[in-house]
């Protein structure tokens, strides 16, 4: 997400609480000429012509640092990260909420991670997604970050850094129970090893 008025960028890593940051930034910097695109988009920034608003800048919701600096190399960038286990729990709640998964967590987690390992990012889905971008799944958080200033969701420091008021949106219910086993934790730790190491999670 790019805020041209403030010359800043926010890297929204999926399932880290970034939607709340986006809303807070949109509340502070109201600009009708830019819009975060929730649908899959190839480029980080695309300009389209609309009947009602004229030119509109569509910004890719989950663009990485490296994608965004191509358009705004001098901006200051921020990113929010989350503990890998909590992030996976959020992925599960999101997919259940979207009715793309109905499998119990302890079976689903293996399908998901082994799907990532073997290049099948949709292996964790029970239904085919329609206009829901799930291509981000296999990516580790560090693949998004680049030179952005890192804040942890657990520390809640990003609000002050961006000078925005804390809000919480898109809080998903726990419809199906989430039960971890030692084996499933180990599997996630192995797959997201670089996130644990570089983001100092244990």
What positions do the PLM features span?
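Membrane-interface amphipathic segments in extracytoplasmic regions
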Residues: 1-202
């Amino acid at each position: 997400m790019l805020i041209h008025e403030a010359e800043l960028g926010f890297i929204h890593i999926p399932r880290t609480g970034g939607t709340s940051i986006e809303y807070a930034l949109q509340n502070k910097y109201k600009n009708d000429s830019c819009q975060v695109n929730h649908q899959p988009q190839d480029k980080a920034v695309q300009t389209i012509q609309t009947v009602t608003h004229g030119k509109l800048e569509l910004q890719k919701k989950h663009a990485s640092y490296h994608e965004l600096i191509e358009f705004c190399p001098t901006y200051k960038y921020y990113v929010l990260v989350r503990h890998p286990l909590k992030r996976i729990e959020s992925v599960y709640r999101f997919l259940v909420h979207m009715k793309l998964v109905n499998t119990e967590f302890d079976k689903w987690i293996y399908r998901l991670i082994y799907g990532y390992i073997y290049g099948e990012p949709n292996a964790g889905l029970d239904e085919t997604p329609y206009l829901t971008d799930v291509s981000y799944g296999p990516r580790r958080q560090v693949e998004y970050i680049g030179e952005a200033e890192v804040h942890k969701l657990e520390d809640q420091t990003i609000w002050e850094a961006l000078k925005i008021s804390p809000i919480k949106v898109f809080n998903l219910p726990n419809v199906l129970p989430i039960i971890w086993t030692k084996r499933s934790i180990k599997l996630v730790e192995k797959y997201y090893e670089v996130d644990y190491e570089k983001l100092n999670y244990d």
